[in-house]
Amino acid sequence: MDKKSLILTLLHLKGWGAKRVYLYVQRYNYDYEKCVSELIEELNEEEKTAFKQELISSKKTIELNSQVGTKVCCILDKEFPKKLFLSSSPCVFLFYKGDISLLSQKSISIIGTRKPDSYFVEKGKIATTFFAKKGYVIVSGLALGCDTIAHSSCLEAGGKTIAVLPSPCDNVQPTSNRQLAQRIIENGGLLISEYSTGSTMTKFNYPQRDRIQSKLSEIILIIQANDQSGTMIATRNCLKDGKRVYAIKGNRISIVHNYVDIDSPEELEEITKWIF
């Protein structure tokens, strides 16, 4: 049993989940050997039986993902960034394609509505290009509209981008963005997901995806949204974790208090002071 099999097994064990897994490995200072040795004391008899069965399933899951070119990373791996679990609603396991090291680089999440107005489309391109050329990794969700603008503009500027998916890495949704996903990987970017190959898409995947987006960056920039937008999920998560949220000037969003004039290099530069 390796690190990844251990974490995936615990994650799917009845009565566990990401929060308990995080607290367990934290208790033993993220020491794999210690986590394994203490399992006998941690699990009751029913859990021990379930663990053995779930371990077989976890190993098969990892192998199936490997067969479709998807790798895995967990909280016990050194490349798994602390910002994913040292906050509310921790993430402890990821499936991915591409350069996993991007998770530890300075980044900004650029998100928004699936149907932006032409004015905000242009402003979104300008903003994304500015940050990409500064060397910041651009994080978004590969949805239509503002997410597509963020990823595409970043690639056109020669930057690196991370797409956080609500679907498995080998089954990109929406299908119309599968070519864009391939371009992201080919240009040194990264696709990440909490969902294994073969997983069924549900409406609950989207808020979980948005939660990951908010964890990866210290800053969120909203291209266009309103109070009813799904973008508010990531926005609220970001604010809850004490991070800064900006919106392009012209938006009216009740919980956002920082607006930026995209035509002002000084205002864009000011945002970079909060990216660490």
List the predicted regions and their residue ranges.
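Glycine-biased, small-residue-rich flexible motifs in mid-sequence functional cores and linkers
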Residues: 75-276
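Short, positively charged patches
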Residues: 1-125, 129
